[in-house]
Amino acid sequence: MKINKKLFIQPILLFAFMSCSSNNQFIEIDYSKNANLVTMEQQFYKSSGSGKLIAKGKNNFVSYFDFISTHNSSSIIFRDFLRRKQFLVEIVDENIRYHDMKNRKDIDIQSFNNFFPIATRMDANTYKKLMWGIPDIFNEINLTTKKEFSVSTKLISVDDRNLINELIFSFNDNVQEYKLLFLDRKFLDKE
């Protein structure tokens, strides 16, 4: 039985070409579906979850975190690579407290800023929006901050709502980068 080489080789080449082509699928985002903090707090009692902070550049580390946020209080616990508690950020109403859990003492924002340099740019509402996954978190970023770093986001659609899944802060023309990646986020319904 004689096999036509062209018929045999063409499907293989077509398969190889299709396998090597990039699969860059761009999806148009419907911003009207972005989560809204007021609406989320009306529907849910709390947001909780976990994630990791990844630093690349001059400082390289991975810190896992757990968070919980309700209407008037929130907290984030950062852990080192061995999952030991490292820092606590506690928010009650508009007050933010930073606590070094290894040394068992409160610290000021500048000390925490050495770990996470965006801290001085975040107020209580920004932390809260971050934990609830609200995409407009940095819409009102001021001009001086824009010169210091850039922010990029990746959204995920959950229950027909766009939520923040990843935030990347790039400093000094991408020499230093801090990525906040949310591994899971749960919402507890109001009863």
Set out the residue ranges of the language-model regions.
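Sec-dependent bacterial lipoprotein signal peptides
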Residues: M1-C20
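Bacterial Sec signal peptide processing site at the extreme N-terminus
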Residues: C20-L37
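A short, Trp-centered hydrophobic/proline-enriched beta-strand micro-motif
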Residues: L37-K58
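Short, hydrophobic/aromatic-rich segments at coil-to-beta transitions
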Residues: Q43-S50, H71-S75, E140, R161-I168
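Solvent-exposed loop/turn segments connecting transmembrane beta-strands
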Residues: K56-N60, R79-Q86, N174-V175
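Beta-strand-dominated lipid-handling architectures at cellular/organellar boundaries
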Residues: N59-S63, I68-N72, L88-E90, N95-R97, ...
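An acidic-aromatic
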Residues: S73-N125
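Gly/Pro-enriched, hydrophobic low-complexity segments
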Residues: W132-E191
